[in-house]
């Protein structure tokens, strides 16, 4: 048993076994991290997911679950899809602005070359 229980075991009010699947990813000093994930996915589902993954990918999976759970808590309707949509909209606006600026540059370059050509004649 770990001398300090991980955030998951504290939240679930149980002893933290030596081989606790949660302890490497939910430290005792960050209880909100597990609470958010538990609220959205449930401890049992998260435990099953982590046990099915290779050890080297578990940390990334936990970070992804935490991010998605926080997004779902913040925006229950859209979750992280709302952020994705917002970012896609910003990208589209920026691409449109870039295209407009490039067109303005092309027009200015054309006018400049016409002016230079007429000066030589």
Swiss-Prot record:
InterPro entries: LOB. Residues 4-105 form the LOB domain. PROSITE patterns: LOB. It comes from the Eukaryota. Belongs to the LOB domain-containing protein family. PANTHER family: LOB DOMAIN-CONTAINING PROTEIN 23-RELATED, LOB DOMAIN-CONTAINING PROTEIN 4-RELATED. This is LOB domain-containing protein 24. The lineage of its organism: Eukaryota, Viridiplantae, Streptophyta, Embryophyta, Tracheophyta. The gene is LBD24.
């Amino acid at each position: 048993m770990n001398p300090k229980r991980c955030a998951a075991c504290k939240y679930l009010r149980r002893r933290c076994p030596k081989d606790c699947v949660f302890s490497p990813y939910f430290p005792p000093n960050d209880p909100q991290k597990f609470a958010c994930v538990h609220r959205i996915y449930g401890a049992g589902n998260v435990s099953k997911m982590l046990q099915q993954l290779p050890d080297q990918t578990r940390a990334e999976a936990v970070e992804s679950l935490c991010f998605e759970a926080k997004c779902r808590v913040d925006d229950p309707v859209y979750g992280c899809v709302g952020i994705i949509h917002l970012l896609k909209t910003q990208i589209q606006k920026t691409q449109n602005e870039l295209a407009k600026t490039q067109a303005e540059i092309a027009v200015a370059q054309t006018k400049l070359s016409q002016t230079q050509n007429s000066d030589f004649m």
